[in-house]
């Protein structure tokens, strides 16, 4: 526990530093989750797999297929969604590289088996692993591979709609309290993405943190 006694008597001489690091990591995870939820809930185009019309009508026959991805790509084309994303790279995140002729799709790690087992309309393997095309393009962090017009990025902490699908009957799918879990795929057509790091940009600090030790008091004058 984070107490004055633990700071004074714990065998870990760097306990305060470790505590601050874990608090920062937790704050970042909360921020990332909130951003994911906001992006998913405000998507301009929403498509459900199979014949479902919302989360609650998804059943065990509605597992993601190549046809679902093809129909999603057509919907995005009809809505004029671009196929060009810019990533910002470099030590100080100032270099830009364009990812052409594709859309970036973010998925949870739970969807990896579904993607790698996917076949196209001719019963041929649809999934192309990233190492097959990495030499000819810029690979994104966490990129797993490609299917059709989509390049899939695995996000280990991707949000899910736990227990918001139909009834789970076979036990072969993720579920919560007997109801199927729904795993969203977030597709991005353009705009820039970067990583948030602790390094300065050379001109200013990115942020400041203030930690109050257990024996220090908060107040309106000292928030």
Q: Which positions does each model-derived feature cover?
A:
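Structured, hydrophobic secondary-structure cores that serve as assembly/anchoring elements
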Residues: 1-14, 88-117
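Alpha-helical scaffold segments that mediate packing/assembly in large oligomeric complexes
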Residues: 6-89
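Sequence/fold signature of self-assembling virion shell proteins
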Residues: 55-89, 110-223
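Oligomerization/assembly interface segments of phage tail-like spikes and tubes
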Residues: 1-2, 21-22, 223
